């Protein structure tokens, strides 16, 4: 549809990239090729910050053809440019992804995680659950004020040894790809209590 109407398709794969959906990228999972794609976080496994913008030849050529001769490709600034340790970390992570077949591991574990995640739908404190692959969101029913229910659940789980992100009253669950079913069971059990 985007190609037919001359619309650029941009995928933000900062969270969904590098296996979180069960495929290397969410775009692959849905069989589309974006014109521009952003990546970060798992690019270096979060060891050091690194962000990436990838684009198709059409976009690249348009930028470079309108840039002064000798310009740096898709220049972003000095703060995040040319950090050798970030590149080394990214290359090491990519090597591990391949050698340990991490994407297939995530793809195989995802149905078990999703089943556990959606088993929480019957809890009185849960308003809505959504998930895909190795990620999920749980909207808590509002307590006395916005953010309180999410924070209380986050704090109780953290004290019980399960760490995740709470944004307002939404719990964001994204288990590590190296976890096992017993770890997912532990996460779900602690969320349930």
Region spans (language model):
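Conserved N-terminal phosphate-binding loop of PLP-dependent enzymes in the Aspartate aminotransferase
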Residues: 1-193
């Amino acid at each position: 549809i985007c190609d037919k109407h001359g619309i650029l398709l941009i995928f933000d794969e900062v969270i969904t990239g590098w296996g979180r959906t069960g495929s290397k990228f969410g775009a692959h999972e849905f069989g589309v090729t974006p014109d521009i794609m952003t990546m970060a976080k798992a690019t270096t496994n979060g060891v050091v910050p690194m962000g990436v913008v990838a684009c198709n030849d059409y976009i690249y050529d348009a930028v470079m053809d309108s840039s002064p001769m000798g310009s740096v490709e898709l220049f972003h600034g000095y703060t995040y440019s040319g950090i050798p340790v970030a590149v080394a970390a990214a290359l090491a992570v990519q090597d591990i992804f391949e050698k340990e077949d991490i994407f297939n591991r995530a793809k195989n574990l995802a149905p078990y995680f999703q089943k556990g995640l959606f088993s929480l739908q019957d809890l009185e404190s849960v308003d809505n659950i959504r998930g895909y692959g190795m990620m999920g969101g749980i909207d808590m029913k509002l307590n006395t004020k916005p953010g309180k229910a999410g924070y209380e659940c986050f704090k109780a789980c953290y004290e019980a040894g399960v760490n995740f992100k709470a944004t307002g009253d939404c719990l964001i669950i994204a288990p590590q790809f190296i976890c096992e079913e017993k770890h997912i069971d532990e996460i779900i059990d602690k969320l349930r209590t």
